[in-house]
A protein has these predicted regions:
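Non-catalytic macromolecular-recognition regions in eukaryotic signaling proteins
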Residues: 21-195
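N-terminal export and membrane-targeting signals
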Residues: 1-13
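Hydrophobic core
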Residues: 12-20
């Protein structure tokens, strides 16, 4: 591998490497965010029982946000400035763990935006770098579980994090890739979302 050139523009350093192509590196030292990630049934997480989508009996539902065919479990716990300020940081981003549960047999696109294009990213599955867009294909409810007897359930669980540069209001758009359905919400991370 031989480095054959560099260019710099708007805080982004471009390394041109023979045999590899182009690698983008942020001048702060971290890789630039990818434009989108894809998660499928194989990248799911599992619990000791089938995952139930929009379970009204589940403990912790007070911290859950439902947006169309998607549940964000634990996201409301980060609206407090005190809780948000205690989050750990990685590569200059606060790390907020939020479980995604997608209704069975759905194909959805999830997009987030904040104060700046890279101020909020999603890192789910085995992603090394965050992205502002996820494409998610959930399992059928009758998909066999890998870690226990039985089936996946009416929701497919994905674990990961929101990466945020600062406390902010995050805009989220969820769209069903098979139908014209689109849902929008604003998520408070360490501050209130004003109308």
């Amino acid at each position: 591998m031989k480095r054959i050139g560099t260019a710099s523009s708007a805080g982004l350093l471009v390394l041109i490497v023979s045999g590899i192509g182009i690698v983008f590196v942020d001048q702060r030292g971290s890789a630039s965010p990818t434009s989108q990630q894809h998660l499928g049934c194989a990248q799911r997480a599992e619990t000791s029982a089938p995952t139930v989508f929009h379970d009204s009996e589940r403990r912790g539902r007070a911290t859950t946000v439902l947006i169309g065919p998607l549940e964000l479990r634990g996201v409301r716990s980060y609206r407090s400035p005190r809780v948000f300020s205690q989050l750990g940081k990685r590569r200059g981003y606060y790390i907020a763990k939020v479980a995604l549960v997608v209704q069975a047999r759905r194909s959805v696109r999830l997009r987030v935006s904040g104060k700046r294009p890279d101020s909020v990213l999603l890192a789910y599955g085995s992603a090394e770098a965050g992205s502002n867009e996820l494409l998610i294909d959930s399992c059928a409810a009758t998909t066999r579980a890998r870690t226990r007897p039985g089936f996946v359930g009416s929701g497919t669980l994905f674990t990961g994090v929101f990466e945020l540069t600062a406390a902010q209001c995050v805009n989220m758009v969820v769209s069903d890739r098979a139908t014209p359905g689109t849902w929008r919400t604003r998520l408070p991370f360490g501050r209130k979302c004003l109308s």
